[in-house]
A protein has these predicted regions:
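N-terminal nicking endonuclease/strand-transfer module with a His-rich metal-binding environment
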Residues: 1-153
């Protein structure tokens, strides 16, 4: 059974989300893992895509959108939403879920649930209590970049 977690962030540094997704972090302290020279280590396996943005310029593009709409300019505004879906290890072991398949699921979920938003979708493996878990992250700008048709629900 997958677990969904949501975090609303007032942090104006959109690049922090990018760094967390791409680089290795200690799962308990959340601090980046550094090599002998003090450089952050890239995750061994990750898949990264952007919706309505380039994944490697997500931060700059979100700032441009916010400036264009004159939104997210004050400290108290929620700047982004971060969704984390963690899969049960059985999904990998018994059903053959791969990182690529999890990324595809993440992209589908983001397209269906966050139309018009700039979004980062990233899948990676992490080890929690000595168990490897596959998870995907969706980070969206709280401001919708593109208009979408109203939905009937």
């Amino acid at each position: 059974m997958a677990i969904l977690k949501h975090i609303a962030s007032k942090n104006a540094d959109y690049g922090e989300a990018e760094r967390y997704l791409i680089f290795q972090h200690d799962e308990y302290t959340q601090k980046p893992i550094l090599d002998d020279e003090g450089h952050m280590l890239i995750r061994e396996e990750y898949y990264l895509d952007g919706l309505n943005c380039d994944p490697f310029s997500f931060a700059a593009e979100c700032m441009e959108t916010n400036a264009y709409f004159h939104k997210n300019q004050s400290f108290n505004e929620i700047k982004s939403h971060h969704y984390i879906i963690s899969f049960d290890p059985k999904d990998r072991d018994e059903h053959g879920l791969t990182g690529e398949q999890a990324q595809k699921l993440g992209l589908e979920y983001a397209r269906e649930n966050f139309p018009g938003h700039q979004a980062l979708v990233c899948t990676h493996m992490t080890v929690i209590m000595e168990v490897a878990i596959s998870m995907f992250h969706i980070v969206i700008n709280s401001i919708r970049k593109y208009d979408v048709e109203p939905q009937p629900y």
